[in-house]
Amino acid sequence: MTATAEKTAGRVVRITGPVVDVEFPRGSVPELFNALHAEITFGALAKTLTLEVAQHLGDSLVRCISMQPTDGLVRGVEVTDTGASISVPVGDGVKGHVFNALGDCLDDPGYGKDFEHWSIHRKPPAFSDLEPRTEMLETGLKVVDLLTPYVRGGKIALFGGAGVGKTVLIQEMINRIARNFGGTSVFAGVGERTREGNDLWVELADANVLKDTALVFGQMDEPPGTRMRVALSALTMAEFFRDEQGQDVLLFIDNIFRFTQAGSEVSTLLGRMPSAVGYQPTLADEMGELQERITSTRGRSITSMQAVYVPADDYTDPAPATTFAHLDATTELSRAVFSKGIFPAVDPLASSSTILDPAIVGDEHYRVAQEVIRILQRYKDLQDIIAILGIDELSEEDKQLVNRARRIERFLSQNMMAAEQFTGQPGSTVPLKETIEAFDKLTKGEFDHLPEQAFFLIGGLDDLAKKAESLGAKL
């Protein structure tokens, strides 16, 4: 699906870090986003450098962003216009392998060269092709299914500062989707730690779900051009599974903030005037180009889960604030919840979903979720009084509510598949019906006699009965 044209050659006239200016013959200037190739030799190393056209400067000059380090590139080197934009391999063959933003296989060099290739710059589906129905994606995680239900074919964000469990929750979702639904997943590692990418590769192989997952990495040590394009490369692979094979695909992006950050670096390198807080003036446009392609078409979908790093825990920062506009559900991971040892460390009061509506999830689900939120909100309101005067100064009704809220908090925790090797406890999947039933009983006080510890890091009602019995209590 990539267009080809007669190849023309230019020469490098200026190099400033990852920014390269190339001069072409008059009338042969390459189009914006075209990929250019330069053959360079650096010591004993010979390699092909890929550049992407970012600006037309006039006088047959183009300004490009390099997708690899420019070590060894010198003025006067010949640069060839490929006549097409960067393209990546697509199809079933990409599953079980790791690729970079250019579509080169990292675990098996040379693999995938003969596959069908699609351009990473594509238009979103036409409005008439979009899926009009809204459907819930059941995950088996109690806190998610009850309070922030995910939309099939929607965009879900995991917000949180550093070290609160965003990557672990993404690994958990890959595990659950592969084991419980047998779906295809595509993982985009955008500007994150190389160590985490290696850990994910090993864990997916150990869990026997690597065969259903394609991984595309552009990590922290890569130039900004690569980090800016790696999400588009992964999305292109996911679009093939959706459009050509009619599959429901899960796209994981870790971390969408690094996509914005790379765009900011590229914008500065290109000499654009910075916008608010130093971000690029095209921030909303670049985010929209990515997010609009992540959608459901009739009968098939791409559901995306995006980790969003929040700089200094500031939610008014333009990067997370711009992401908010595109989301169907937000799961906020909180340091306060994390410090209590509750995992996943989801803040139920700060998280939200557009489909927590009786018309979509049903009256009973909505009623139970709202009652849980009411109890937790009241508990939060009472925290100052408890801290100053102590719990004994509360009314009997409030004491009962506080005890119930503490049980709800602990019951929202769950043993996870991604943490099995650390906890020694198998991960649990709780059906939505059982989750609603359990929390309905909990809010009505049917479990008030059970010790708080019985609710901690367990699955459903069967687990609760076993834990309670081990602590000398009965349901």
UniProtKB/Swiss-Prot annotation:
Annotated binding of ATP, by residue: G160, G161, A162, G163, V164, G165, K166, T167
Signal sequence interval, chain numbering: none
SMART domains: AAA (SM00382)
Protein name: ATP synthase subunit beta
Function: Produces ATP from ADP in the presence of a proton gradient across the membrane. The catalytic sites are hosted primarily by the beta subunits.
Keyword Nucleotide-binding set for record: yes
Membrane-related topology note: Peripheral membrane protein
